[in-house]
């Protein structure tokens, strides 16, 4: 039995029906769970003697609108957690979808892995995913007056406001975007169009 097969077996033994999906792809294991089970699953991932994922390496938000060929019919927003077990030398990815696309909320894991604090703030700022119970959920990368969440797929590519220096006021001012919207479809050079010679 390989290490990945052993990890998958341990995950199935420990979680049973608490995980809704277990997948191996490119020598990496990904599991999914429902949002109400997140804290239970997270605590077991960290504390169970067969798992020992004591390190949260990264956490990121994902917007699955128009995922793949546009045929995605699942929930829109997810948080993806990347874990490392230093003592067992294994890695794991956990994906949890927020149950409400209009107001995505997941429980915070800051009490389990304190490093999640700024990761969750970044995910909130860029995707608008709320983390219930977070000690200080406020914007991290965008300005305090910023409108919207720039990594959402429905956010306008040119933004909503632009800032410029106003020499009369001697400060930076915000104004509505003056750039005309345009179709930003990438141009593809097909292989048959290359000149080989």
Curated annotation (Swiss-Prot):
According to its UniProt record, which reaction does this protein catalyse? Answer: a quinone + NADH + 5 H(+)(in) = a quinol + NAD(+) + 4 H(+)(out)
Entry keyword annotation includes Nucleus: no
Topology term for the membrane: Peripheral membrane protein
Report the principal subcellular site: membrane
Q: What is its EC number?
A: 7.1.1.-
Name its cellular compartments.
Cell inner membrane
Any one Gene Ontology MF annotation carried by this entry is: NADH dehydrogenase (ubiquinone) activity
A GO term from the CC aspect:
plasma membrane
Instruction: List, alphabetically, the InterPro entries matched.
Output: NADH_DH_suC, NADH_quin_OxRdtase_su_C/D-like, NADH_UbQ_OxRdtase_30kDa_su, NADH_UbQ_OxRdtase_CS
> Which key words are in the record?
Cell inner membrane, Cell membrane, Membrane, NAD, Quinone, Translocase, Transport, Ubiquinone
Keyword Ion transport annotated: no
Q: Name one Pfam family in it.
A: Complex1_30kDa
Top-level EC class: translocase
Oligomeric form and interacting partners: NDH-1 is composed of 14 different subunits. Subunits NuoB, C, D, E, F, and G constitute the peripheral sector of the complex.
Q: Kindly give the NCBIfam families that the UniProt entry links to this protein.
A: NuoC_fam, PRK06074.1-1
Q: What does this protein do?
A: NDH-1 shuttles electrons from NADH, via FMN and iron-sulfur (Fe-S) centers, to quinones in the respiratory chain. The immediate electron acceptor for the enzyme in this species is believed to be ubiquinone. Couples the redox reaction to proton translocation (for every two electrons transferred, four hydrogen ions are translocated across the cytoplasmic membrane), and thus conserves the redox energy in a proton gradient.
Entry's family note: Belongs to the complex I 30 kDa subunit family.
Could you identify this protein by its name? NADH-quinone oxidoreductase subunit C
Q: Which organism is it from?
A: Methylobacillus flagellatus (strain ATCC 51484 / DSM 6875 / VKM B-1610 / KT)
